[in-house]
């Protein structure tokens, strides 16, 4: 029986509580348990030695983790993945720092990883590769003669040609992507951008059932919006707040606004702070009656752009609080630290407004988690950016343009004063979508489609059989 082989930049924690794991890790773990398999990824360690893979077995799942050398980490992860692909795919060409040697290192690491994975893979195994760190991974596998079914899911947006054309290795990246059998995207706009970019550099034949032919390769390009575990989130949210937080919530009269993001320039945090400032300026009735909590733990702190955004937010938070605070009231709480996911779900449930306004986002699961954590009898209101993939599904949120500070301020005012009947109606429409398109559905849909695609070995076998008749 074929196994599922998952490859991602970081491997999931082998020992960990389900309530602290993200939805993606839980969904993939469940899929691995169903059919047995292997999870292959980086262990987060830097080592100059050629260390063997760290292997661990948990029931019918094997975890195989590799370390990286400093030069590999720098070129593959820090430089090309996170200072070229990440900013470009989030429409920030001004932050791209491209060097050919970094791209070469990126491809070299993908080839090295494919070489280390190959001995662990059986001929009939199905490979599921995740995210932008591994765009060329299938090409590296094919180079080694691997004919397995290989699927790829891009968790971040795929940019339009005006952006993608600025990347020097764009043709190479597109050709390498066509070595996958199935390429999955968060939204139809991402899928269309992929095909549009392909059509600019090679002949693309549009076939049936979302299949295309490019570079003499058949690839299926399809949309799979990622979901969450609504029932698990509800259970976490319904639990009591820790005593200190419960006491703090009791002391805080008025309404709470919550945002939770990684500290990243794609999340629109400075623009969000400015919109909140506009709310306090233009709607003075809310002063003293609301508090805004922005939780933004540091990520990629060794990249200069992330250091810059942290400094900017600290400055903005201090300026806004300095202008509006009183002895009894502080309007904005900026928390640059990590909180357990289980605690965040409880916090979401006690906040009247969820403010999720990225400038560009593949999906944004925080939006779905906020809705799933709400009390159906007294739900909060979600304010969501048009530019998040989640906006395609959560159409009953208050949808906003994150660049329009007046528009976001107006949406905040509307959310803070929305009657219960409207809050309930919007919540019911959104939670129905979230339950229908949950993480299990996402995993199952992708893997079912991948299994239906003939492997390269089957295609070769059919061709040989036909030629001998």
Curated annotation (Swiss-Prot):
GO terms for biological process: trehalose biosynthetic process. It comes from the Bacteria. The record marks 86, 156 as: Involved in alpha anomer selectivity. Pathway: Glycan biosynthesis; trehalose biosynthesis. It holds the Pfam family Glyco_transf_20. Its EC number is 2.4.1.15. Signal peptide: none annotated. Keywords: Glycosyltransferase, Transferase. SUPFAM superfamilies: UDP-Glycosyltransferase/glycogen phosphorylase (SSF53756). GO terms for molecular function: alpha,alpha-trehalose-phosphate synthase (UDP-forming) activity. UDP-alpha-D-glucose binds at residues 22-23, 262, 267, 365-369. It catalyses: D-glucose 6-phosphate + UDP-alpha-D-glucose = alpha,alpha-trehalose 6-phosphate + UDP + H(+). D-glucose 6-phosphate binds at residues 10, 77, 131, 300. Belongs to the glycosyltransferase 20 family. Probably involved in the osmoprotection via the biosynthesis of trehalose. Catalyzes the transfer of glucose from UDP-alpha-D-glucose (UDP-Glc) to D-glucose 6-phosphate (Glc-6-P) to form trehalose-6-phosphate. Acts with retention of the anomeric configuration of the UDP-sugar donor. Homotetramer. This is Trehalose-6-phosphate synthase. The gene is otsA.
């Amino acid at each position: 029986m074929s196994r599922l082989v998952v490859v991602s930049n970081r491997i999931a924690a082998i020992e960990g509580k389900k309530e602290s794991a993200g939805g993606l890790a839980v969904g993939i773990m469940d899929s691995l348990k169903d059919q047995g398999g292997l999870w292959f990824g980086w262990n987060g360690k830097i080592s100059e030695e050629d260390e063997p893979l760290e292997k661990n077995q948990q029931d019918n799942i094997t975890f195989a983790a590799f370390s990286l050398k400093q030069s590999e980490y720098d070129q593959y992860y820090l430089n090309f993945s996170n200072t070229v692909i990440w900013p470009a795919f989030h429409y920030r060409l001004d932050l791209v720092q491209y060097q050919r040697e970094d791209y070469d290192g990126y491809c070299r690491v993908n080839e090295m990883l494919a070489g280390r994975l190959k001995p662990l893979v059986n001929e009939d195994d199905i490979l599921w590769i995740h995210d932008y760190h591994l765009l060329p991974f299938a090409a590296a596998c094919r180079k080694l003669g691997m004919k397995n079914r290989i699927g790829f899911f891009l968790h971040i947006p795929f940019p339009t040609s005006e952006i993608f054309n600025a990347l020097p290795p764009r043709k190479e990246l597109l050709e390498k992507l066509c070595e996958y059998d199935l390429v999955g995207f968060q939204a139809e706009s991402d899928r269309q951008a992929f095909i549009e970019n392909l059509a600019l550099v090679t002949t693309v034949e549009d076939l049936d059932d979302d299949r295309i032919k490019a570079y003499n390769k058949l690839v299926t390009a399809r949309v799979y919006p990622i979901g969450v575990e609504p029932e698990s989130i509800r259970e976490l949210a319904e639990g009591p707040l820790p005593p200190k937080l419960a006491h703090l919530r009791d002391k805080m009269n008025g309404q709470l606004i919550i945002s939770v993001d990684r500290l990243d320039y794609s999340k629109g945090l400075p623009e969000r702070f400015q919109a909140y400032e506009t709310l306090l300026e233009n709607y003075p009735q809310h002063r003293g009656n609301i508090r805004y909590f922005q939780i933004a733990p540091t990520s990629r702190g060794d990249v200069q752009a992330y250091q810059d955004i942290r400094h900017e937010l600290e400055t903005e938070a201090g300026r806004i609080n300095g202008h509006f605070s009183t002895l009894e009231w502080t309007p904005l709480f900026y928390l640059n630290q990590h909180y357990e996911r289980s605690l965040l779900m409880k916090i979401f449930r006690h906040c009247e407004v969820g403010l999720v306004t990225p400038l560009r986002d593949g999906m944004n699961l925080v939006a779905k988690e906020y809705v799933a954590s709400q009390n159906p009898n007294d739900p909060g209101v979600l304010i969501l950016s048009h530019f998040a993939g989640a906006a395609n599904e959560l159409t009953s949120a208050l949808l906003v343009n994150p660049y329009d500070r007046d528009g976001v301020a107006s949406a905040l005012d509307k959310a803070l004063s929305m009657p219960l009947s409207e809050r309930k109606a919007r919540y019911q429409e959104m939670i129905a979508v979230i339950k229908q398109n949950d993480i299990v559905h996402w995993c199952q849909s992708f893997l079912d489609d991948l299994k239906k695609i003939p492997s390269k070995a089957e295609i070769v076998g059919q061709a040989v059989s036909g030629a001998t008749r």
